[in-house]
Structures are given as C-alpha cells and as structure tokens.
Amino acid sequence: MATHLFTSESVSEGHPDKIADQISDAVLDAILEQDPRARVACETYVKTGMVLVGGEVTTSAWVDIEELTRNTVKEIGYTHSDMGFDADSCAVLNAIGKQSPDINQGVDRASLEEQGAGDQGLMFGYASDETDVLMPAPITYSHRLVQKQAEVRKSGKLDWLRPDAKSQITFKYENDKPVGIDAVVLSTQHCDSVSTETVREAVMEEIIKPVLPSEWIDGNTRFHINPTGRFVIGGPMGDCGLTGRKIIVDTYGGMARHGGGAFSGKDPSKVDRSAAYAGRYVAKNIVAAGLAKRCEIQVSYAIGVAEPTSISIDTFGTGVVDEKTLVALVREHFDLRPYGLIQMLDLERPIYRPTAAYGHFGRDEFPWEATDKAQALKASL
C-alpha cells in the first residue's frame, strides 16, 4: 500500500494579499457592470494606512475607485486603526492608465469568434474525485477553516477575532485517497486583551471541530493554533499585500501544476484567468463523467491567436480511455478559443469579487463548476 503526506494552505479575506485581490476584483466588477467588454488589468498594493490601485483599463465606464476601495476594506472588516487598518482613514492612490494599443490590436477582431488571446501563456485545470466538490482535500478543508474563521468573526460569536488568518492542513493518503489528517495549523489575528489559552481553546471548539470530519482526526493528529503565541499585529500593518501573490491558494493548493498567471483584476479576455477557469470546467466534467478519477489539462495560447497552441491531458493512470481520446473529446465538446470560452462560461459579467477569497474552484456558485457536459462526454464513447 502506497502512503504519503500532502499539505495545502489557505488565507482569510483579511490577509493583505487577499485584500489586494478583492479590491482589484471589486474594480473589475464595477467596470464590467457598465461595460461588459471592457479591458481591465487592475493591480493593488496595500500597506499601513495606504492602498495603491494601478494598472491598465480601456472602457466607457466610470467608477469611483476610492469609494470602491474603502467599501471593500470595510466589508472585509478593517474598520479601526487598532486592527492595523482603517477603511475610512487610509489613503487611496489611483494610478490607472489605458491599455496599450499594441496589445489591443492583437485581441480585438471584426469577428468575435476570432478574438485573439490577450497574451501568450499556459494554463492548467484539475479535478479529483477525492471530495464532493471534485477538488483535492487539503486545499478544500484549508479554505473551509478560514471561511469558518470569518463566519465566527463576523457573527460576533468570538468578537476578539480580527480579519487576518491563515490555515494549513497535512493529509495522509493511502493509494492516492485521503484517509486522515496528520497536522492542522491555524493562525488568527486577535485583539490585544485576549489570552493565548482562550484563543487556542475557542479556535479548536468553534472553528476546527465544526469543519474537519471527525473520522479523519485521531490521537496522532497534531494541532498548531497560533503557534507563535500572539498575533495582534496583522493585516497590512504586519505585511504589505499585493494582487496575484496567492496563486496556489487560489487554485489547487499545489496538487496540480500552475502556469504562473494570477487571476484577480483581469477581465476575461486575459486567458490567464478565463482559460484556467475553462480548464477546471473541462477537468471537472471529465471526472464527473467517470472518464478518470483525476484529471489535469494544460492549454496554451499565443498572443493575438484564437486557437490554442496546444491541449494536453494527464489522468495519472486513472483514465478509462487513453489521453489522446480525451483530447479529441475536449476539442469536440469545448470551445477553448478565447471568445468561445467566454461565451461557454458567460464570463463578461460582474462575478469576480467573490472569487478573490477562499479559492476560485470547488464552489458551486461559479459557472466553471457546472458538470453539464459530463453526460455528453460519457455518451460520446
């Protein structure tokens, strides 16, 4: 029997890098609401008392960057300088310019179907049958821990919790199936007046136990709750935050490969984002159809060219048909040209802000999580 350990981490919506991601996607959504075919590449930097929003935008829309930024920070929960950041008093700097016409001429076409890719690059999609959402268990439960932290914090149940938090889970695998949890790490920001003992006890009872299945926990499972003992200074006061710095948290927790491109702040003409979503859609439908237990797809593009330069699939020995057959099925049932996948997943609309925390995949509310092609894939064999 083959055994191994695998670890993934997640971070909360109050983590500095995630604040940046959420601001970038809030700007994107506000623009897409007015101008669905806008070109947006929005980057955000946050540090003590300051938010810098920059990038390139081509649009007919007008949005109030300062108001959007403050509202986003407020919704996350940074409402007082005692927390290390205050939505009402932080400086908001706007450094947004226009998209280069050299890029634009390679993307826009008279025929929408021939729209070229916004850049070269390679993107991966992945799915696995090890959880109900067809995602790897380590990243799925790491996300659920920090989501629970936010839920408990916002409900007021533990009113001393603060927005910044991180989680990490090490799973035990036997024959590529998760069978238990070896270690759990959860660090959460808290107010100055609460003791470390209180934090550890409450986090275990209110966050960890309600989230992690008891059958995966045993006497050998190790728990590290605020292992440094104190986490009062957090958020942008503790670390600066930058859009696109949590690409493994955003995807599969390291279980699958990554092409390197970040998602947040990018409109769907950027294949870094849209093709990664389409890759997840393809891989999930292949697994949902029972054609493989695990599936990873790679798609690549050239700037200004509509057709993908390559499509390849790896099922890690779990496929019921060979990978060449799967690639042929993908070409038959999925349009992976930039505009084709935008239409397939209905991406030209303001749906991106919620993706910017707790992972872009494994959440049923997003269109790339649908398994509506599974039956057709199965029937094609």
From Swiss-Prot:
UniProt binding sites for K(+): 43
Q: Which InterPro entries match?
A: ADOMET_SYNTHASE_CS, S-AdoMet_synt_C, S-AdoMet_synt_central, S-AdoMet_synt_N, S-AdoMet_synthetase, S-AdoMet_synthetase_sfam
Q: Which reaction does it catalyse?
A: L-methionine + ATP + H2O = S-adenosyl-L-methionine + phosphate + diphosphate
Q: Where in the cell is it found?
A: Cytoplasm
Look up the EC number in the record and give it.
2.5.1.6
Q: Which cofactor does it need?
A: Mg(2+); K(+)
Cofactor annotation comment: Binds 2 divalent ions per subunit. Binds 1 potassium ion per subunit.
Enzyme class, spelled out: transferase
Q: In which pathway does it act?
A: Amino-acid biosynthesis; S-adenosyl-L-methionine biosynthesis; S-adenosyl-L-methionine from L-methionine: step 1/1
An annotated GO cellular component of this protein is: cytoplasm
- PROSITE patterns recorded: ADOMET_SYNTHASE_1, ADOMET_SYNTHASE_2
PANTHER family this protein is in? S-ADENOSYLMETHIONINE SYNTHETASE
Q: What does this protein do?
A: Catalyzes the formation of S-adenosylmethionine (AdoMet) from methionine and ATP. The overall synthetic reaction is composed of two sequential steps, AdoMet formation and the subsequent tripolyphosphate hydrolysis which occurs prior to release of AdoMet from the enzyme.
What is this protein identified as?
Answer: S-adenosylmethionine synthase
Q: Specify the species.
A: Alteromonas mediterranea (strain DSM 17117 / CIP 110805 / LMG 28347 / Deep ecotype)
